[in-house]
């Protein structure tokens, strides 16, 4: 009998200075070749479990640990990340903290050099993993010129280049555009099916990955709350924690259709079987700039921004024309490297266009893509002193973490801390900027925390501040935005109402939009109304016969 690639017995762990256990008596086996999805709310223990499986807990983070854990046949309490590195690959939630080399090629060669691979073997492995992740064009780039999504691809490639027995991934699609995210899940499925690589993938956006998994585990308060098949998990989530259910599962639940579908393909097949034919998608997304008259919060006029990516200068923004009105809520979307972060940095005055202009007449506050850029203290409470800080911590659900080190928080908790810092800073200044820019703020956030972010954005909007959020999260954009601006190659390629843009695209579309085609529905609530209407019509036709 083959031993599990991960074996955990009664594992309890607490970070230094933490007030509570992050893992509490947890037991788990992962078999060779399994594809396991870890679900759970922010702070439920997913990140800590992955850190324990690769030795970062306790060897890097310290803290108190009890129980037993083995990974790839090694006792993790006696063997740290260096010993486990050949057999266990990790993609952390914050790739900027994981990438250590100057160039992309050097980063990918590093794990192979540590195993004394020959130059020829290193070259072949690097070329193959770069092709698999569609990133040969990045190999000679310097890492400090990469976008967040590009950096995440590099971290993925470095984890996969040595073909480990076990790959641990902590929200690996959080900074990837929908195309790259789908490609990644396809690659993981191929590694799993063709090479027998065990995959443990922690995700909040489960609609992307459940169909590829053999098994789904839900965590809560450092324990396993559910362990079963993806379909059983969706049924459990709808009954016990609907925030964990996929949009497609919520769509079917609201429409009174069961069982919940695992993925878009299965959902469409189930609807066809019931005679509820999805409407086929039509056309391209619109180009309809805003006509809202509230005064400009952001104006970009023929703006060109040039950056040196390590291989020479290139135009990141190419004569961009864009306008955001006061009080608007706008989602800025586009593939990795399309220019989203560059536009936000230009709006905040951190980059100057070579020609043209980008201006925020009422001022601009920016939450950067890397939340760690905002942390300068060793305690969460010290990052947010005073009444405004306490209120901001309570608003994001981190009041319990005042004594913790920001570095010990999960990725979602760090993201929430960064949001709290921006919220508290705005309150302390007493002046509301005309434009609030957030760069990928939903990374690591569960649905409940995303709802909190949406409520905060709507409050700012009601006070006449524009909120511009760069995001790859189409489900969040559908809930947050009134309008979507879609960038491609530094130019605006679509600009219009959120329902039109996110219902009309192939990749930049919500799960409900992909299930129901060109119906115009992008959220489960409206989609369920359409399905109920179709059911009534079908019943009427059947009765008439």
Model-predicted segments: where are they?
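Catalytic Walker B motif of ABC-type/P-loop ATPase nucleotide-binding domains
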Residues: 167-170, 436-439
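ABC ATPase nucleotide-binding domains
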Residues: 235-294, 508-545
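ABC ATPase C-loop
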Residues: 159-160, 423, 429-430
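A short, surface-exposed alpha-helical micro-motif characterized by mixed small hydrophobic
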Residues: 209-211, 477-479
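ABC ATPase NBD Q-loop/coupling interface
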Residues: 57, 68-83, 350-359, 363-371
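H-loop/switch region of ABC-family ATPase nucleotide-binding domains
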Residues: 203-204, 471-472
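Conserved ABC ATPase "signature" region
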Residues: 120-138, 389-401, 424
């Amino acid at each position: 009998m083959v031993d599990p690639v991960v074996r955990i017995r009664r594992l309890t762990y607490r970070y230094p200075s933490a007030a509570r256990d992050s893992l509490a008596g947890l037991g788990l086996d992962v078999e060779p070749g399994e594809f396991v999805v870890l679900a759970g709310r922010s702070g439920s223990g997913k990140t800590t479990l992955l850190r324990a499986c690769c030795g970062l807990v306790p060897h890097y983070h310290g803290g108190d640990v009890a129980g037993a854990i083995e990974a790839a046949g090694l006792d993790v309490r006696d063997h740290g990340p260096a010993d486990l590195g050949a057999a266990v690959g990790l993609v952390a939630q914050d790739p900027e903290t994981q990438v250590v080399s100057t160039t992309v090629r050097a980063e990918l060669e590093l794990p192979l050099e540590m195993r004394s691979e020959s130059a020829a073997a290193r070259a072949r492995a690097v070329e193959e993993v770069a092709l698999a992740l569609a990133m040969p064009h990045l190999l000679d780039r310097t890492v400090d010129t990469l976008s967040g999504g590009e950096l995440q691809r590099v971290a993925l490639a470095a984890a996969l280049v040595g073909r480990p027995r076990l790959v641990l991934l902590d929200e690996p699609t959080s900074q990837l555009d929908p195309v790259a995210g789908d490609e990644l899940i396809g690659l993981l499925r191929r590694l799993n099916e063709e090479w027998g690589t065990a995959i443990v993938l922690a995700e909040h956006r489960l609609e992307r990955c459940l169909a590829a998994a053999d098994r789904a585990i839900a965590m809560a308060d450092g324990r396993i709350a559910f362990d079963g098949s993806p379909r059983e998990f969706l049924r459990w989530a709808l009954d016990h924690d609907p925030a964990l259910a996929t949009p497609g599962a919520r769509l079917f639940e609201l429409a009174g259709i069961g069982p919940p579908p695992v993925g878009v393909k299965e959902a469409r097949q189930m609807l066809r079987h019931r005679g509820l034919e999805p409407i086929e998608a039509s056309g391209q997304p619109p180009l309809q700039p805003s006509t809202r008259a509230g005064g400009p919060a952001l104006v970009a006029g023929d703006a060109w921004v040039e950056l040196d990516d390590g291989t020479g200068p290139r135009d990141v923004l190419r004569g961009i024309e864009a306008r955001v009105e006061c009080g608007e809520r706008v989602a800025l979307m586009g593939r990795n490297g399309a220019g989203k972060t560059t536009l936000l940095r230009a709006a905040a005055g951190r980059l100057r266009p070579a020609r043209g202009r980008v201006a925020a007449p009422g001022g601009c506050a920016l939450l950067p893509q890397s939340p760690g850029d905002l942390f300068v203290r060793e305690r969460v409470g010290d990052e947010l002193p005073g009444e405004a800080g306490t209120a901001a911590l309570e608003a994001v659900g981190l009041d319990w973490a005042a004594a913790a080190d920001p570095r010990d928080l999960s990725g979602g908790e760090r993201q929430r801390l960064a949001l709290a810092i921006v919220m508290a800073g705005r309150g302390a200044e007493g002046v509301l900027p005309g434009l609030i820019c957030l760069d990928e703020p939903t990374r690591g956030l569960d649905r409940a925390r995303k709802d909190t972010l949406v409520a905060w954005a709507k409050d700012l909007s009601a006070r006449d501040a524009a909120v511009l959020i760069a995001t790859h999260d189409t489900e969040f954009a559908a809930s947050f935005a009134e309008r979507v601006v879609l960038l491609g190659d530094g130019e605006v390629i679509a600009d219009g109402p959120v329902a039109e843009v996110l219902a009309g695209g192939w990749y930049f579309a919500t799960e409900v939009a992909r299930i129901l085609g060109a119906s115009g529905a992008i959220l489960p609530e409206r989609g369920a109304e359409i399905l109920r209407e179709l059911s009534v019509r079908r019943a009427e036709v059947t009765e008439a016969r």
